[in-house]
Amino acid sequence: MNSSTVNRVTLVGYCGETPEMIYIKSTGNPVCNFRVATHKNYKNKEGVNFEATIWHKVSAWNNLAEYVAENVKKGSKLYIEGELSTSSYTTPQGVRKDSVSIQISELKVL
């Protein structure tokens, strides 16, 4: 096992929707899923400045999910630390889809 790897994400961005808390049927654990927007500035070939919005899927679990549900609203500026998590599923048409999200370990409303 290689212990010299890192899976860590830090975001400062804006909540794009009011988080909804759901409960996992098998465990009863709460989770809040929502999206956070960050922005990237760049210049095109002609030197014109543009701003691109990048959307990140994020999830908060258990006590952190309850905190998010009570304190985070659409438009809230957030500081988030967490790790990337991947999952995959197969569509009814038999196509495999992969999804990446950020599992939040620390969140502050700024």
Predicted regions and their residues:
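Single-stranded nucleic acid-binding surfaces, predominantly the OB-fold ssDNA-binding core
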Residues: 1-110
